[in-house]
């Protein structure tokens, strides 16, 4: 009987192996299609998981691009992936085929966070009616902000003053600016979403920031890729909660803030912020099962604004200050322009940037060199498309290697150096560059770009109006190489802020 049982188990195991190989074979069929992008041979049942460094995929993509060209394919277990490199390929996919590449891959593994057909937020939402509804709402709310007592620019200007006060408290001693930058930018998002600000030592502020930063680390690594490619694994009890505890805790905090905000709402008054405006839309959509305005989606829209809106802008500012202490000649030229255009009596205003071409060029070069979101957010094809002569089938995940655009050697004079002149013409006037894509491109480009540009200019100029920054005496010059954790953070550093 034991022998029979052993034989039966052997047969079942063999049948399972054959079944998995057949499934794997079916998912490889796209590789045999004419003009499908080349790529490394995937392993049965694993695809190319062991051939890509998921702690920092950029390193693997550099090698694969040299071997296979600007458009190459990967197999994420059974999910087909195409990586796009260089300005020509990325522009063709995201701009020329904007409609066909505006979808997102499904995020089944985030169901434990409340994602579903009617609650996808904005950033990760599938391309369709709900996304268009939320994108339109978010853009119009950002544009029309000012329904409350303060305009968005006034909020940023006020927060920049608070940030300067916090820098002054360091009394010229060496310190890392990262935490203070995170707090300042978070308060701008808090003003937009909850019409309030937090004191920099507020325990809730500190916890919120910690959860955002630690939650980012849950976005990278091999296990995350396995779960995305085999979403059936999400049904293993407790697995997702164990792998993404900080993302869950972050959403719990957002729920608490929304609940408190609802209790203070005066319906006789106009909306104070985005949350109030969303609640008004929910009231109008009541009874419409197709509407994306619901409690579940409110928490995700607010969460996306907080996480994406805070960390990208504060990280860019951290890069800006690092590059200023590494390039004091550039810092002096920015300060000279500030002195000539703004002076020392009043604070910078957004209208000043039209008269400050060098400062504007420096901020653009910070974003290009810093390369904050190197791989963008994944897209997915909604139909067969052709890019650079290759046929990419419907349902293929697209990774846009924005690093390869921002550091494209065929476009930039000095792609791997910090060189503000990339954005200046021969007469010293600011000039735009087509390959400047830190916010991506096409229909899914970052909706918060106008807010980010305002924050970067006002925070940066206010800080350089008030302080001169330098490497602390006795410390070596910090590295200008980044640390990858979904975003690209500057290597840890300290600086001294001396009042001017």
Curated annotation (Swiss-Prot):
Domain of life: Eukaryota
Organism: Sus scrofa (Pig)
Keywords: Endoplasmic reticulum, Heme, Iron, Membrane, Metal-binding, Microsome, Monooxygenase, Oxidoreductase
Protein name, entry field: Vitamin D(3) 25-hydroxylase
PROSITE patterns hit by this protein: CYTOCHROME_P450
Membrane topology category: Peripheral membrane protein
Role, per record: Catalyzes the 25-hydroxylation of vitamin D(3) (calciol), 1alpha-hydroxyvitamin D(3) (alphacalcidiol) and some C27 steroids. In addition the enzyme catalyzes the hydroxylation of positions 11 and 12 of dodecanoate.
GO BP of this protein: arachidonate metabolic process; xenobiotic metabolic process
